[in-house]
Amino acid sequence: LRAETQDYILDKLSELLRRKTIAGTGQNGTEYKIITIVLDLPKEILRFIQSFDFTKCPPKLIIVNTTETVISLEDSIIVAFLNLIGFDIVFFIPTGYDNVNKYFNNQIMEEHIIGNYLYDIAIPDFNRLRSVKEKKKSFFSRLFG
């Protein structure tokens, strides 16, 4: 990563710790877990952070949870960090369960209830849909190869 990106990540990590957004920060070693998770972000996220121009249009992250499972501490830390660096994050929880706020001290989200609650729905396999779309050729590509 470029030095500017590394400095930006470290500044935002420091701010995340200072704000104590994650429950337990400053107690039981939670701050060490926060540091470890942020400094060990997946390579795809780091590359995206480095290549994205936050001044033009903030990046978007959509998280769909159709189960009763509560978001993990690790995922909560990543979400809080990405929110702090400028990501617009949307949780789509059709069940209406409160399975997101467990590890957040501060209210970092705004809740909107839209329509009826839905249960036992499956998330489509977008990778499969993409491969089917790629296999389909247009009329002209079939004619002209």
Language-model region placement:
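Structured N-terminal alpha/beta-domain signature
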Residues: 1-17, 41, 45, 49, ...
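Histidine-anchored nucleotide/phosphate-binding helix
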Residues: 72-88
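Catalytic core of nucleotide-activated saccharide and alditol-phosphate transferases
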Residues: 101-111
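Conserved N-terminal ligand/cofactor-binding loop architecture of enzyme catalytic domains
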Residues: 1-34, 110-145
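Glycine-rich anion-binding loop/nest that anchors nucleotide
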Residues: 60-71
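Short beta-alpha junction loops
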Residues: 66-68, 86, 93-101
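Acidic/polar, low-complexity linker and loop regions
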Residues: 25-62
